[in-house]
């Protein structure tokens, strides 16, 4: 019986693909070597310890229907579209070795006519007249008895969108998370015009088979053809939940400030696990009571635009004379935290 397993995803859903990855990693036999090839439609994927409000322009992501997905490995934030090919290598210990999987990807690129090399801990680069250009980034995860190496290859990604979603609004945001490093990148299509996801996947598969000296049939998976994986439904539900993607953010503080015709407002929030643990309101308004009441109401709430907006609008019943101000405040808060 082969010790290899090859999975190909037909789904562009990042939550589906990451749930598949998680289930296989947890349940694979320690003697198995797994290759999983996949790609995501418009998604910002953040590292396990990152703060989405710090790393991402969450408001623009919402406007453009870009998903947020938190992975289980560390590292920085990346933007995925269908111009990225994603790969995951898994193996039990002591065989797990990220240098082996890196060598397989480099061999695949070489077979396509691209000479690349490893740079630092996480990247693959090609040398150009303008210097090294990054074509692949990776992240890793290890447990007591197994490990995985996953990463992306830039084929024909819309690089202009990296800045759209990975550069947050310039807010007074202080955080304890990890800040992403955004280096010079290049698409493989610049070196190999017409290169496709299918060609890259086939090259990686062949390099995988060649390294281990055996072959195996691919398992093609999709939401309509889900793999037989115990607890997959529960894993997918967690992977797609707000509590995982946003609520797992490291503790941070956020300061919002704005001047309205009726006065200036400062809101100070301390947020842990996606919930407000402390809220303070400061204002030079002649009627500060609604803001003081709002600060008290927000403690314990999820740090979500719609939740904060609802809490603000709920105060209209207590302060009907300030209805116009509260509605204006509500709209501003909703926009500021998205």
Curated annotation (Swiss-Prot):
Keyword Ion transport: no
Gene designation: lplA
HAMAP family linked to this entry: LplA
Entry's Gene Ontology cellular component terms: cytosol
Name of the molecule in the record: Lipoate-protein ligase A
Xref: Pfam families: Lip_prot_lig_C, LplA-B_cat
Locations listed in the record: Cytoplasm
CDD domains documented for this protein: LplA
Species the sequence originates in: Klebsiella pneumoniae subsp. pneumoniae (strain ATCC 700721 / MGH 78578)
Residues of the BPL/LPL catalytic domain: 29-216
One of the record's GO molecular function terms: lipoate-protein ligase activity
Top enzyme class: ligase
This protein's UniProt keywords: ATP-binding, Cytoplasm, Ligase, Nucleotide-binding
